[in-house]
C-alpha cells in the first residue's frame, strides 16, 4: 500500500508525526506478523518542497500535490486550528486551496481519502462528502454542520468509514485514523502495532466532549441549553420545554438536531452525565444524592447511563 500524507505550513505537528510513526512501525513489523503482507510505503505530499508544522518541525516534501492520484491512500491531517474562525481562515489560504483542488481531482473509486480533525473540513470543501457519514473535531461540530449540512455527521464515533472515505475526530484521533488504515491491511498487524506502541482502542470521542464548549448561534438552541442547565434536577419533557421557550416541539427538535446533531433528550442526558461526573469529582455527595441533583430518581439509573457511556467510549 502506498500512503501519501499531505502536509502544509501550519498543519498540526503531532498529527503528522503520529501518522508517520504508526505507519512506519507497521511496515517494520509486518514481517513478524505475516510475511505475505506487502510493503507499506509512506511519502509526504505538499504544495512546496519544505513545510513547517505547528511544532516547528520541518518536513521535506517527497511529491507534489499533482501526484496524489498515484497513491492508494491520501491522508489529510489537521490544519492546526482550534476555532471556527481560524479554521475558516486556514481553508482560504493558498496552500489549503491547492490541497482542496487536488483532493477534488482524485478518483473516489481508486483512491481512499483519510482525514482527521479540521482536515475533514478540507475534504468537505471538495463537495465529495454530500450524504456521506463522517466525523470531525467534536468542538467544531456545529460549525461543520453549518457549512456542510448534507453530511451525516457522527460526532460520537472516533473513526467513521464510508466507502473509500475515512474520517476521524479531534487532534490525537490521528492515532486512531492511522491504526484504522493499518487494520484495513491486516487486523493482526494493527493489533500488534497497538501493543508495541501501547495504544488503547477508543471507538468513541463522546467521553471527551465538553458541551459548554459547543458554541451554537441558533437563539432557540441557546435558550434551550440555558433552560435545561438550570433545571437538570427536574423531570424533562420536551413538549413542556418547547412551550416554555415559545416554540413547537417539532421546531425545537429540528433546531437542536441541526446545531448539535443530538435529540433534545440526548443532549439533556449528556449534560446530566457531565454534571454528575463533575459532582463526583468535586464533592463528597453520595451516588444517590448526585442522581437526584441531575434529575434521576435513583443511583442505579445514573450508574446504568454512565456504564453505557463508558462502553461507547
Language-model features and meaning:
Residues 1-113, 122-124, 190-191, 200-313:
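Extended, subdomain-level signal for the structured scaffold at the beginning of enzyme domains
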Residues 17-20, 24, 145, 175-179:
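Predominant activation on well-ordered alpha-helical scaffold segments within soluble catalytic domains
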Residues 108-113, 128-133, 164:
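Short active-site oxyanion
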Residues 122-129, 174-175:
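Acidic/polar active-site rim loop that often engages polyanionic ligands
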Residues 130-157:
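A conserved active-site-flanking secondary-structure segment within enzyme catalytic domains
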Residues 153-166, 192-212:
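Conserved Rossmann-fold dehydrogenase catalytic segment
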Residues 161-196:
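Conserved anion/nucleotide-ligand pocket segment
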